[in-house]
A protein has these predicted regions:
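Residues at the N-termini of beta-strands
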Residues: 1, 85, 184, 204-205
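Zn2+-dependent cytidine deaminase-like catalytic core
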Residues: 1-28, 142-144, 157, 196-198
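Flexible, gly/pro- and Lys/Arg-enriched active-site loops
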Residues: 199-212
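Short beta->alpha connector loops at strand-helix junctions that form conserved
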Residues: 22, 161-162, 210
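Active-site ligand-binding patch in enzyme domains
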Residues: 34-36, 40-53, 57-183, 192-195
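Conserved beta-strand edge residues that scaffold enzyme active sites
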Residues: 25, 165, 191-192, 212
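Conserved functional loop/turn residues at catalytic and ligand-binding sites
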Residues: 15, 181, 201
Length: 212
């Protein structure tokens, strides 16, 4: 948006032939995050969904951490590395206690995406592994000063975005991430948050891992 075609004009004025629109579809796919942020004022959103063959996202005892095998988990971590932000919900953090770090072959990467936690009522435990590595942003519907302070002491940033029914405004959250120049968001959340994002039309791509 800072250039807005002026670069092409400058090249032409310098006597350089410039063709535009070549391989437009392929170029858009390569830059889907940036293009979505420029045209829709939000990042490209990719949601990971792991399910059993019969369509469930958790076991009968409520466990959801290891539905899929190591190959699927390693593939999912690859997408974490490509993202500008990893988005999850408080239910997932409380149930699975994930670190949600970007790793390749088990090695922690030097560049860690921003980790974003949707937690409407600040129920998260500051001792969760979520806060162990990288920058973290906790998004609530209404800030509680005491709870917020405990999270800030763990290095987290707090953002209050009130939506309907006392929940976080997810559309406003994506606009805020776009303002922070996040091009791609990788969602690793439970059925509630992922389903709500799909319902609102905020998911551009689904990564479905199905375990027999």
């Amino acid at each position: 948006p800072l250039v807005a075609g002026r670069g092409v004009e400058m090249l032409r004025q310098a006597g350089i032939t410039v063709d535009v629109g070549l391989l437009q579809k392929e170029a858009w796919q390569m830059n889907a995050g940036f293009m979505t942020r420029m045209t829709e004022n939000r990042p490209w959103v990719r949601a990971k969904v792991a399910m059993s063959l019969d369509g469930f996202t958790a076991l009968t005892n409520g466990e959801s951490q290891w539905i899929t095998g190591p190959e699927a988990r390693e593939d999912g971590r690859r997408y974490r590395c490509e993202a500008g932000a990893i988005l999850t919900g408080v239910g997932t953090v409380l149930a699975d206690n994930p670190s949600l770090t970007a790793r390749v072959d088990g090695k922690l990467q030097s560049r860690q995406p921003l980790k974003v936690l949707v937690d409407s009522h600040l129920r998260v435990n500051p001792e969760n592994h979520f806060f162990d590595e990288g920058q973290t942003l906790v998004v609530c519907a209404k800030e509680d000063l005491e709870k917020s302070q405990r999270l800030r002491e763990k290095g987290a940033k707090i953002l209050s975005l009130s939506g309907e029914n006392g929940r976080v405004d997810l559309q406003a959250l994506l606009k805020e991430l776009a303002r922070r120049e996040v091009n791609e968001v990788h969602v690793e959340a439970g059925a509630t948050l992922t389903g709500e994002m799909v319902r609102l039309g905020l998911v551009d791509e689904l990564l479905c891992y199905i375990a027999p």
